[in-house]
């Protein structure tokens, strides 16, 4: 094994450093310099920028295989820091951005789609390591695929519900549906490149899954406690969710939605209570239920923005 490790990391080895930097490039830009990250052979795609790939590989070796150094080099480059906005001219000349004419932008992986609202809401439990956890899942799924329906899924309570998605217990015959909807591999086989789909079911998960509804309520509590003025609350909400301030038109639209939600939940207290009791975390009873439910609706909208679940 030592001989193999020395062979793989030998400066004269033509493959290891190239595969490594291509993988990191793919993580940052969405697509590797060699698009077929799983195949560097003759049947794989040719690199879009072969000289850049070779330079990064030699730089990795020169830096003694310092991954952090290479990542810092890439993210501080002018190429990475470009705006992801596209013009008709750029779209016509470089539709798939293989020429790197604009900054990278794509939907986050399934695990990050779930972790992001937990972090924004303050629910994310940041413990590192430990046993697998079992977050919310629809009732009865395991029974339907188990022998004699004896295998039951029991969700965790407390911090286990809010751990990072990488710690989620994975049953290969019944993977977590919330993450499978966002193209998480089923782990039956090794997957190097994930698919990225865009389906109506994904929007329904973000709007209705208990994880996201509960995160919206916890986020709403943060927003309300931030400031007493709606304008400042909305600014804080946008900064937290999408790392920018709202445009005037966005502010007006969300303000109208907030007013409508306040009116609805004031008239329908049962609907407000039903919304606020989703999930296991404790509800802040110092906030009036109708007000909290209205801001929960606003928080849910912000957490469902394409901008929120996409890498900017």
Identify the residue ranges that each predicted region occupies.
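Primarily short, surface-exposed interaction patches in extracytoplasmic proteins
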Residues: 1-162, 179, 185-195, 207-290, ...
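A broadly conserved detector of short glycine/acidic/proline-rich loop/turn motifs that flank catalytic sites
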Residues: 124, 170-172, 210, 302
């Amino acid at each position: 094994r030592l001989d193999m490790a020395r062979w793989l990391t030998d400066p004269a080895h033509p493959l290891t450093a190239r595969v490594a930097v291509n993988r990191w490039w793919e993580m940052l830009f969405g697509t590797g310099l060699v698009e077929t990250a799983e195949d560097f052979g003759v049947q794989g795609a040719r690199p879009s920028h072969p000289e850049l790939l070779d330079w990064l590989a030699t730089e990795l070796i020169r830096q003694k295989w310092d991954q952090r150094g290479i990542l810092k080099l890439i993210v501080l480059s002018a190429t990475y820091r470009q705006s992801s906005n596209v013009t008709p001219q750029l779209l016509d000349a470089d539709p798939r951005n293989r020429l790197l004419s604009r900054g990278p932008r794509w939907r986050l992986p399934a695990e990050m789609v779930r972790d992001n609202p937990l972090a924004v809401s303050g629910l994310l439990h940041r413990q590192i390591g430990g046993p697998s956890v079992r977050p919310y899942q629809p009732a009865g799924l395991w029974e339907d695929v188990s022998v004699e329906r004896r295998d039951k899924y029991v969700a965790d309570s407390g911090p286990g519900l809010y751990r990072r998605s990488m710690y989620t217990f994975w049953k290969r015959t019944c993977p977590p549906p919330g993450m499978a909807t966002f193209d998480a591999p089923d782990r039956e086989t090794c997957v190097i490149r994930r698919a990225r789909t865009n389906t109506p079911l994904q929007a329904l998960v973000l709007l209705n899954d208990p994880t996201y509804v509960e995160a919206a309520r916890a986020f709403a509590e943060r927003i309300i406690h931030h400031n007493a003025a709606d304008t400042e609350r909305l600014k804080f909400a946008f900064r937290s969710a999408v790392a920018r301030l709202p445009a005037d038109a966005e502010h007006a639209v969300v303000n109208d939605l907030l007013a409508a939600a306040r009116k609805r939940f004031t008239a329908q207290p049962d609907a407000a209570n039903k919304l606020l009791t989703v999930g296991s975390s404790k509800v802040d009873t110092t906030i009036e239920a109708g007000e909290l439910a209205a801001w929960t609706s606003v928080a849910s909208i912000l957490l469902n923005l394409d901008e929120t679940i996409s890498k900017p």
